[in-house]
């Protein structure tokens, strides 16, 4: 029997040395897979099957969960934290948040919860607000120019020429315009007997005496001040706005603000309906009517998705179409702009649609939209760059 010659089949073997993961596009290569079920990346770069499903615990009304030295679950309005340490008892905080879906992120020992803007501390099990608000309700607020130590001054006299025989430590207000002796053009001076000369005392700060404010704010916080009669009184034109707290005093705050106006050298006491300015020598007064109470706030933006990258919490707001970053290591300050590397950061994006997620990958903060990916580069606000 004679058989026809058959073409010999060549044997070949192809090795995949790099696993590319999931690729749902049309250009899926041999080192990738377009879809999969029951796979796991725990043995990366090798692809393995997942572990069998098992029941860990039963939860009702779950709105979010996050693991940081333990598992935090948000069930309805309650927070339940189960530490990883053996024998540690779970911590429950009832009525801590509103009932709704949450975005959570961890930094340090704290887990931040949005949109409620609260932080759960895994170290002591406490819940605290990220923002803070102080408002004058039935109490008066005092505004006075002060030095870098928070000290306010009183003078016994003023004029164009200093006294001929001053006492040691005597204060004198040297004026440039006698018709406006309390204006910012005048200079507060103090006499020193040891040197025999007068020294200028700069009053570049404002001491805000407001009972309870010292418990809500901390040093270097950025506080938004509203409702003051400072501009109306002719003391400061920029007291209303974002100010940096340079020091927390016994019963108030010390903020930096440039003195501008014809009545800088005086004290302003403001109540719910009126305000009164008194000169440094106590001899002149002026009264004003006010309609809004004094309000001080440490603001936190409304964020839809959050992630942590390089010791900052990053978040995005679909309402404003803005990406925010908190101050370095401080998730309570989101509007701190002092011109240093630890400043907060914000950038408006030009893409359409709402944000759909946020993540940190390979040291970069990523923000997702349906058809856009925004990527943040850089290590400090001065060199942050956004690519899309």
Task: Describe the predicted segments one by one.
Residues 49-59, 150-159, 297-388:
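Beta-propeller and closely related beta-pinwheel folds
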Residues 81, 117-133, 170-202, 252-257, ...:
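Short, surface-exposed terminal/edge motifs of secreted or surface/virion proteins that either
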Residues 4-8, 131, 183-221, 226-300:
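Small/polar beta-strand repeat architecture
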Residues 55-69, 94-108, 135-147, 298-308, ...:
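Repeated scaffold domains used in trafficking and secretory/extracellular systems
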Residues 71-72, 109-113, 163-190, 218-226, ...:
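Short hydrophobic/aromatic-rich beta-strand motifs
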Residues 68, 75-77, 107-108, 114-116, ...:
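Short loop/turn segments that connect beta-strands within the blades of beta-propeller domains
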Residues 1-38, 43:
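Short, intrinsically disordered N-terminal pre-domain segments
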Residues 93-99, 139-171, 175, 201-204, ...:
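Extracellular/surface-exposed low-complexity repeats and stalk/linker segments enriched in Gly/Pro
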